[in-house]
From Swiss-Prot:
Protein name: Cytochrome b
Cofactor note: Binds 2 heme b groups non-covalently.
Entry's localization field: Cell membrane
SUPFAM superfamilies linked: a domain/subunit of cytochrome bc1 complex (Ubiquinol-cytochrome c reductase), Transmembrane di-heme cytochromes
Assembly notes: The main subunits of complex b-c1 are: cytochrome b, cytochrome c1 and the Rieske protein.
A Gene Ontology BP annotation from the UniProt entry: respiratory electron transport chain
InterPro entries per UniProt: Cyt_b/b6_C (IPR005798), Cyt_b/b6_C_sf (IPR036150), Cyt_b/b6_N (IPR005797), Cytb/b6-like_sf (IPR027387), Cytochrome_b (IPR030689), Cytochrome_b_C_euk/bac (IPR048260), Cytochrome_b_N_euk/bac (IPR048259), Di-haem_cyt_TM (IPR016174)
Pfam families: Cytochrom_B_C, Cytochrome_B
Assigned keywords, A-Z: Cell membrane, Electron transport, Heme, Iron, Membrane, Metal-binding, Respiratory chain, Transmembrane, Transmembrane helix, Transport
Protein's job: Component of the ubiquinol-cytochrome c reductase complex (complex III or cytochrome b-c1 complex), which is a respiratory chain that generates an electrochemical potential coupled to ATP synthesis.
Comment field (misc): Heme 1 (or BL or b562) is low-potential and absorbs at about 562 nm, and heme 2 (or BH or b566) is high-potential and absorbs at about 566 nm.
């Protein structure tokens, strides 16, 4: 049988499969998918986040094979992974550092969307699906942080689950349901482990929907103008796949540095102490990617008020397409918005710093000012800038 016959047979098999399950057509669509020709390296962040998600799922599944979700054995099983499982230390550090790298990519991805107006029509649903992914990521990361069953894991779970008790009438039953009893204990750990395993696969489904929404109207671009002809676009492959690999290289260099040289830099030393319900840590601190929201939570003395503000800080992102009244997408052509954007970024970083500090003065008072500006940016600054700002002239073509 010569090569031509073999090639025809293999093509026939591919066509037979593709007719019934169009996998190959779908992959071909990605190859020929037309993308704006002026995308910069900030558009790599979506692909980087996708790679980070795959790494988390692979390492998480392998770690789950060796983890014991029981309050008497969870801490020891993690230490056993570190010492007795082949390359267990690498798996654990890759998973722990990978969570931080995933959030870093997502935060930059969101910041890029805010600056370039990627939430504006016709991409509102694309933005909303992205925020839902972010919410589920936060829930997944929180439950994952509980699993090592160290001091910070236990007390972090106690503090955060207790927040639901602030809800009038139904708060206490919700907390008891979350705990599976009257305190954080074995049922809590078991259900957190089950949900932590499940949620990444829900994220995968949402990522697919995110991509479907993206391909419906195409990517936004740094100029924030619509594509008018095929001259404004280039195929995603090979042009942007090659560009993505450059971003992957930078990402993996930073990733490798933390894994091999500073694996615990982003963690907390108290989590290397087994959970003890009788001893409260001097300072309960969440992971760095929750610190801005933690600062918002602690900014007011009322528990219900803090919970309301913390969840409101994320809900306001859903309303963003309608709060920003400007018709111009890109911050490059909005001089006043550009200043407001960088002030907002500084405010978010400052909230992260304040979230890492003890609940004492002057941090509480400063936090209130920072939280006030956070909400003013969305509810006051954006609507007013959209009405009164004089944007720069938009270019005609990409």
């Amino acid at each position: 049988m010569n090569k031509e016959i073999i090639h025809k047979k293999s093509n026939g098999i591919i066509e037979w499969i593709d007719y019934r399950l169009p996998i190959f057509s779908f992959l071909k669509h990605f190859s020929y998918y037309q993308t704006p020709k002026n995308l910069n390296y900030l558009w790599n962040l979506g692909s980087i986040a996708g790679i980070a998600l795959v790494i988390q799922i692979i390492t998480g599944v392998i770690l789950a094979m060796h983890y014991t979700p029981h309050v008497d054995h969870a801490f020891e099983s993690v230490e056993r992974i570190m010492r007795n499982v082949n390359y267990g230390w690498l798996l654990r550090y890759t998973h722990a550092v990978g969570a931080s790298m995933f959030f870093a990519a997502i935060y930059l991805h969101i910041a890029r969307g805010l600056y370039y107006g990627s939430y504006k029509t016709p991409r509102e649903l694309l933005w909303h699906i992205g925020i839902i992914i972010f919410l589920i990521m936060m829930a997944t990361a929180f439950m994952g942080y509980v699993l090592p069953w160290g001091q910070m894991s236990y007390w972090g779970a106690t503090v955060i689950t207790n927040l639901f008790s602030a809800i009038p009438l139904v708060g206490e039953p919700i907390v008891i349901w979350l705990w599976g009893g009257f305190s954080v204990d074995n049922p809590t750990l078991n259900r957190f482990f089950a949900l932590h395993y499940l949620f990444p696969f829900i994220i995968v489904v949402l990522v697919i929907l995110h991509l479907v929404a993206l391909h419906q109207h195409g990517s936004n671009n740094p100029k924030g103008i619509d594509v008018k002809s095929t001259k404004d676009t280039i195929p995603f492959h090979p042009y942007y796949t090659v560009k993505d690999f450059v971003g992957f290289g930078v990402y993996f260099i930073i990733f490798a540095y933390f894994i091999f040289y500073a694996p615990n830099y982003l963690g907390h030393p108290d989590n290397y102490i087994p959970a003890n319900p009788l001893v409260t840590p001097a300072h309960i601190v969440p992971e760095w990617y929750f610190l801005p929201f933690y600062a918002i939570l602690r900014a007011v003395p009322s528990k219900l008020g803090g919970v309301f503000l913390m969840f409101g800080s994320i809900v306001v992102l859903f309303l963003l397409p309608w709060l920003d009244t400007s018709k111009i997408r890109s911050g490059n052509y909005r001089p006043i918005y550009r200043i407001a954007f960088w002030i907002f970024m500084a405010d978010c970083l400052f909230l992260g710093y304040l979230g890492s500090k003890p609940v004492s003065e002057p941090y509480i008072t400063i936090s209130r000012f920072a939280v006030c500006y956070y909400f003013c940016h969305f509810l006051l600054v954006l609507p007013l800038i959209g009405k009164y700002e004089k944007p720069l002239p938009l270019p005609k073509v990409l």
